[in-house]
Swiss-Prot record:
Gene3D superfamilies named among the record's database cross-references: Cystine-knot cytokines (2.10.90.10)
Entry function: Together with the alpha chain CGA constitutes follitropin, the follicle-stimulating hormone, and provides its biological specificity to the hormone heterodimer. Binds FSHR, a G protein-coupled receptor, on target cells to activate downstream signaling pathways. Follitropin is involved in follicle development and spermatogenesis in reproductive organs.
Name of this protein: Follitropin subunit beta
Signal peptide: 1-18
Primary residence: secreted
Sorted UniProt keywords: Disulfide bond, Glycoprotein, Hormone, Secreted, Signal
PANTHER family: FOLLITROPIN SUBUNIT BETA, GLYCOPROTEIN HORMONE BETA CHAIN
Entry-listed glycosylation sites: 25, 42
Family: Belongs to the glycoprotein hormones subunit beta family.
BP GO terms, sorted: follicle-stimulating hormone signaling pathway; G protein-coupled receptor signaling pathway; regulation of signaling receptor activity
Family annotation (InterPro entries): Cystine-knot_cytokine, Glyco_hormone_CN, Gonadotropin_bsu, Gonadotropin_bsu_CS
Length: 129
C-alpha cells in the first residue's frame, strides 16, 4: 500500500513541478496557389505542458502571465514545391524549432489562440517528399 501511495505522490509531484515541454516531430502540408502539388514534410516543433495557474481574484497591479510550451530557438528551412508555373516562385520557407521552453507566448510569431489553426491538409494532389 505504501508503494502505491508513493507512486501516486511521485506522479503528482512530477506533474506539478516538472515541465514536459520538448521538441516533437510533426508533419505539415505545404502548398502554393501557383503550383499544382502539395507536399508533406517532417519538421520539429514544441509540444507539452507547462506549469501555470489562473488566479480566482485578479490583481490589476500584478500581471497574470500564462506560460506556454513554445520555441526558444528556431531556424528556417526552404523546400521547392513541384509543379509551379515558370513565372511562379516555387520556394517555400518554414520554421523548424531547435530548442523549447516554457514562456510567454509571442503573438508576433506564434498562434497564441485557444484553438489553433487546425489540422494541416492538402487542397491539391499530394506528393510525398
Amino acid at each position: 500500500m505504501k508503494t502505491v501511495q508513493f507512486c501516486f505522490l511521485f506522479c503528482c509531484w512530477k506533474a506539478i513541478c516538472c515541465n514536459s515541454c520538448e521538441l516533437t516531430n510533426i508533419t505539415i502540408a505545404i502548398e502554393k496557389e501557383e503550383c499544382r502539388f502539395c507536399i508533406s514534410i517532417n519538421t520539429t516543433w514544441c509540444a507539452g505542458y507547462c506549469y501555470t495557474r489562473d488566479l480566482v481574484y485578479k490583481d490589476p497591479a500584478r500581471p497574470n502571465i500564462q506560460k506556454t510550451c513554445t520555441f526558444k530557438e528556431v531556424v528556417y528551412e526552404t523546400v521547392r514545391v513541384p509543379g509551379c508555373a515558370h513565372h511562379a516562385d516555387s520556394l517555400y520557407t518554414y520554421p523548424v524549432a531547435t530548442q523549447c521552453h516554457c514562456g510567454k507566448c509571442d503573438s508576433d510569431s506564434t498562434d497564441c489562440t485557444v484553438r489553433g489553426l487546425g489540422p494541416s491538409y492538402c487542397s491539391f494532389s499530394e506528393m510525398k517528399e
